[in-house]
């Protein structure tokens, strides 16, 4: 018998492998989409918070927080807008000022937290001596100089609130490239007003 041979039929194991590969690609796409959504939300929120910083109103109609300061970190292309109240909900949208701390530049410790993989990812390159610019909503502008960088265990260490002079403390999760979120380690950058040096 001469002529073309019939194409072999796809065997069952090959179909199962194909289905498995398609499912794996769908799961991977969903994971990447979720990661992209987190970064997109963080970027969009900062744009809305910037508008609220200028106008004095809430960043969105249902918000129970307001921007209190603008923060410019070394090497950052854009300023970050800091929300009042260090809740997890606020941290999803931007850096947040701890409710128990003072406004930047006031006597006491101003503690601002942010996520290591979005707003505070640039803290990984921070060095002692770097300058951090802060502008409060009331127009006061303060330049801080990084005095110390530490990694602490949040289960054991507590941040002092009752310091006798203005101090800025930036806090984020550590290590910066951690695979699992919510570990106990925190990267803590302590800064003092440049005018006091």
Q: PLM features: residue spans?
A:
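N-terminal Lys/Arg-rich, disordered targeting/topogenic segments
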Residues: 1-14
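Solvent-exposed, non-transmembrane regions of membrane-associated and secreted proteins
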Residues: 13-197
């Amino acid at each position: 018998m001469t002529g073309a041979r019939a194409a072999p039929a796809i065997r069952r194991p090959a179909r199962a492998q194909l289905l498995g590969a398609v499912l794996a690609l769908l799961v991977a796409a969903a994971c990447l989409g979720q990661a992209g959504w987190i970064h997109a939300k963080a970027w969009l929120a900062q744009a809305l918070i910037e508008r609220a910083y200028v106008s004095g109103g809430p960043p969105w109609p249902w918000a129970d927080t307001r921007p209190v300061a603008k923060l410019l970190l070394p090497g950052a292309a854009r300023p970050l807008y800091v929300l009042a109240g260090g809740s997890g909900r606020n941290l999803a949208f931007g850096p947040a000022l701890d409710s128990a701390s003072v406004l930047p530049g006031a006597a006491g410790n101003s503690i601002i937290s942010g996520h290591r993989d979005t707003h505070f990812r640039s803290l990984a390159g921070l060095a002692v001596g770097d300058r951090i610019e802060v502008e409060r909503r009331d127009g006061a502008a303060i330049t801080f100089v990084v005095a110390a960088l530490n990694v602490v265990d949040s289960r054991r260490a507590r941040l002092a609130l009752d310091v006798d002079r203005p101090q800025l403390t930036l806090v984020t999760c550590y290590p910066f490239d951690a695979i699992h979120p919510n570990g106990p380690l925190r990267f803590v950058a302590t800064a003092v007003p440049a005018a006091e040096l």
